[in-house]
Amino acid sequence: MKMKKWTVLVVAALLAVLSACGNGNSSSKEDDNVLHVGATGQSYPFAYKENGKLTGFDVEVMEAVAKKIDMKLDWKLLEFSGLMGELQTGKLDTISNQVAVTDERKETYNFTKPYAYAGTQIVVKKDNTDIKSVDDLKGKTVAAVLGSNHAKNLESKDPDKKINIKTYETQEGTLKDVAYGRVDAYVNSRTVLIAQIKKTGLPLKLAGDPIVYEQVAFPFAKDDAHDKLRKKVNKALDELRKDGTLKKLSEKYFNEDITVEQKH
């Protein structure tokens, strides 16, 4: 009788363990249908909060992609330098926040096809007549967001380190610092600057042509699972380009199509 009771207890315990394993697999399958995406939530007009809701060009592009591949989105908001770290450690699947495709980043990540094109642009005070190109920045203090491709593009154009580059954790405060003379200039995406100058009404202007043009795409870790996911996203982007969604979203935010390669 005791042996029977013991057998029943063992079987019950095994069933409980198997049940738990089953639940774990179910949860994993649920997670397989979730795309973990990073953004700053402060990058107007690409990924920012409006009335407490995350929105912007990059956000809407990613939402359209997720709908095409039938996946849910889990957004994680961090400073840009922190986003790249989370992607590298596998805590994020990708980033939807104007990540430029660079040779350095391609060593670590696989990128999707580009969904936009960006130019690193200099912005100065409206009454500034001294700065017209990157050569005029020597001896000047120039703001840039830490870890951004725009900061790196500026550094690449300054091999002798004659430009004093002042880095910021976020975009917040950069334009005001230029307008109030606390820094001489600021570098960011041309489209971002056009939108921000219009939104803020600050006395600023673009100085010269963009110093670098780059593709913007979604980065993924270099492993089989993420490569499979990347290929799904590529297919979705092809469909969104073909049906006009990418162009429509671009014109909504910029009054121009930044999803096609710039001729320069």
From Swiss-Prot:
Keywords: Amino-acid transport, Cell membrane, Lipoprotein, Membrane, Palmitate, Signal, Transport. One of its GO terms (biological process) is amino acid transport. One of its GO terms (cellular component) is plasma membrane. InterPro entries: SBP_3_CS (IPR018313), Solute-binding_3/MltF_N (IPR001638). Induction: More strongly expressed in the presence of methionine than in the presence of sulfate. It is a lipid-anchor. SMART domains: PBPb. Residues 1-20 form the signal peptide. A lipid is attached at residue 21 (N-palmitoyl cysteine). It is found in: Cell membrane; Membrane raft. It comes from the Bacteria. The complex is composed of two ATP-binding proteins (YxeO), two transmembrane proteins (YxeN) and a solute-binding protein (YxeM). Belongs to the bacterial solute-binding protein 3 family. This is Probable amino-acid-binding protein YxeM. It comes from Bacillus subtilis (strain 168).
